[in-house]
Amino acid sequence: METMCEVKVITGTSAAAEAAKLADVDVIAAYPITPQTTCVEKLAEFVANGELDAEYIKVESEHSAMSACIGAAATGARTFTATASQGLALMHEMLFIASGMRLPIVMMVANRALSAPINIWNDHQDSIAERDSGWIQIYVEDNQETLDSIIQAYKIAENEDVLLPVMVCLDGFILTHTVEPVTIPKAERVREFLGVYEPKHAYLDPDRPITQGPVGVPDCYMETRKQIEEAMERAKKVIRDVNEEFAEWFKRKYGNGLVEAYNLDNADTVLVAMGSVCGTIKYVIDELKKEGKNVGLLRIRAFRPFPKEDVKELLKDANNIAVLDKNISLGFNKGALGIEMASILKNKKVCNYIVGLGGRDIKIDDIKTIINHVEKAEDDSTLWVGLKE
């Protein structure tokens, strides 16, 4: 069990860089974009100082960054990159190739709004737009979870029952540029926890030639999609197991790995959300509890694979369900999380709240407004919270 560690007061991007170093990655592909730039800068510093023995590839675009990771991962290397917003959008083509080739790349996404208008602040539109790309998506609440989740991501992605890439998503500026105390485990402990990555399907060996990424003709393409879907389903158990194993090694865990339940016992009103806003929600819940009001939170940690079974079980007794979305499905007037929740909880009142787009502050009073609205609403509805009149 872990007995020695170091505590540093660092930003979310530094926590991500520390995690990549602890994972002893072989290849880093780097292209700067706000607000993730300080992550790849910190990794460049680690490599230059000899703290990390990795190939650091400076590329000309995010499309090239993912292409480099794909090429490296196809040789059997453990790879890492980071991006945000328009950079993630530029990667779109290559994201599908990474998952289709079953390459366990790990990427930190510093969630940032998409242009236009140009906006460097936080919402979830960038990663949510890639939810169907075959990548596992984990959304973190704080900087400690950022470090821990990136370490966990390699254990999940490299599992032979999964072999899919993972995005670890943290809120831009709210986490990326905010300092918090983060416990840094010993490198040798992390490397023992992760083990050596020895892929059987992706390698470069002249004595064992293989073909990777060939043409998928109609006779086989559909089966490859089904295989990815089956791997996503298997990933649910792997995510749970890795979360438990991580807790045994490092004394920290995050719900059951897929979701975190907070004050759900006997809660008739439950808020559902992802990311750093959950910290604000927990504060409001604690304050309301002092007043005798019982409200719960279901934090969705893994948006892909989506934890349908957990949602159904944990919300079976709730009658007022408020889903907060930092994204909007334009033309449907709901966020992606709200759409998912409504499709699962067909016989319950599920109201959707669009919040925090482009970095708009989500205040304590906004959370209270949401609670009051969902309790009075007669049926499903969508409300934009904090919108200027």
From Swiss-Prot:
Report what the protein is called. Answer: Pyruvate synthase subunit PorA
InterPro entries, alphabetically?
Answer: PFOR_II, Pyruvate:ferred/Flavod_OxRd, Pyruvate_synthase_PorA, Pyrv_Fd/Flavodoxin_OxRdtase_N, THDP-binding, Transketo_C/PFOR_II
Tell me the organism: Methanocaldococcus jannaschii (strain ATCC 43067 / DSM 2661 / JAL-1 / JCM 10045 / NBRC 100440)
Q: Which GO terms describe its biological process?
A: response to oxidative stress
Extract the CDD domains matched here.
TPP_PYR_PFOR_IOR-alpha_like
- Quaternary organization: Heterotetramer of one alpha, one beta, one delta and one gamma chain.
Gene3D superfamilies hit by this protein: 3.40.50.920, 3.40.50.970
* Enzyme Commission number(s) of this protein: 1.2.7.1
Provide the gene name from the record.
Answer: porA
- Report the catalytic activity: 2 oxidized [2Fe-2S]-[ferredoxin] + pyruvate + CoA = 2 reduced [2Fe-2S]-[ferredoxin] + acetyl-CoA + CO2 + H(+)
Q: Which GO molecular-function terms appear in the entry?
A: pyruvate synthase activity
Q: Which PANTHER family match?
A: PYRUVATE-FLAVODOXIN OXIDOREDUCTASE-RELATED (PTHR32154:SF0)
| SUPFAM superfamilies linked | Thiamin diphosphate-binding fold (THDP-binding), TK C-terminal domain-like
Entry keyword set:
Oxidoreductase
Q: Where is the signal peptide, in residue numbers?
A: none
